[in-house]
Amino acid sequence: MSDYKELTKQGLWKNNPGLVQLLGLCPLLAVTATLTNALGLGLATMLVLIGSNILVSLVRDFVPKEIRIPVFVMIIAALVTTVQLLINAYAYGLYLSLGIFLPLIVTNCVIIGRAEAFASRNSVAKSAFDGLMMGLGFTLVLSVLGAAREILGQGTLFYGADQLLGEWAKSLTIHIWQVNTSFLLAMLPPGAFIGMGLLIALKNAIDQYLATKQPKVEQEAPTRARITKVN
């Protein structure tokens, strides 16, 4: 149980793919203009991450080390294609909105990194849980950044939720304030870089604050051994 607790801490906070490892920055910065897009890409990435970890863990004893990376990439590509077809069939608006960044999940270093560093060396259950926590941590960063940019940029939240959840989700759109023109800095990539930097700074500040609250372990002063000369 302690192993799963540690995996949870690593994926959500200590070793978060977005805030600590700084992996997957291309889609993270390009697609997070709205919360809906951020959630869509985050959930797609999480599904691929869980599936790839499970499959890699299953075949880890049968794949020669010399060709393991190409095999892992093929597994990831097959899963991404499956997820892409599902989104195209059931959430076409989101499919158009995500564009090229959906198939680019194949090149996301988070997925290939976890497949190589964890799934290829651990059991199926632990690999699946690691994929879930890492994917959830990545999705949370995407969602927070997407929500902040959407609020600052156009004064709404969950705009276009019907692209992800269907027609009924149009009622989920929240108009926080009325804006005549969009705040372009928040909507464009420079705003994403600034927002991401602020999130990383906030996490580091929280870590430093928590570190100061930890009880300090006092080290015992070394005692000098007294040597008595024996004649």
Swiss-Prot record:
Transmembrane keyword on record: yes
UniProt keyword list: Cell inner membrane, Cell membrane, Electron transport, Membrane, Translocase, Transmembrane, Transmembrane helix, Transport
Membrane topology term: Multi-pass membrane protein
Cross-referenced InterPro entries: NqrDE/RnfAE, RnfE
Transmembrane segments: 18-38, 39-59, 69-89, 93-113, 128-148, 182-202
EC code: 7.-.-.-
Alphabetical list of Pfam families matching this protein: Rnf-Nqr (PF02508)
Cellular component terms per the entry's GO annotation: plasma membrane
Broadest EC class assigned to this enzyme: translocase
The organism's place on the tree of life at top rank: Bacteria
Compartments, as annotated in UniProt: Cell inner membrane
One BP term from GO: electron transport chain
Family: Belongs to the NqrDE/RnfAE family.
UniProt cross-references to PANTHER family, sorted A to Z: ELECTRON TRANSPORT COMPLEX PROTEIN RNFE, ION-TRANSLOCATING OXIDOREDUCTASE COMPLEX SUBUNIT E
Subunit organization: The complex is composed of six subunits: RnfA, RnfB, RnfC, RnfD, RnfE and RnfG.
UniProt-listed HAMAP family: RsxE_RnfE
Role: Part of a membrane-bound complex that couples electron transfer with translocation of ions across the membrane.
Entry protein name: Ion-translocating oxidoreductase complex subunit E
Lineage: Bacteria, Pseudomonadati, Pseudomonadota, Gammaproteobacteria, Alteromonadales
The encoding gene: rnfE
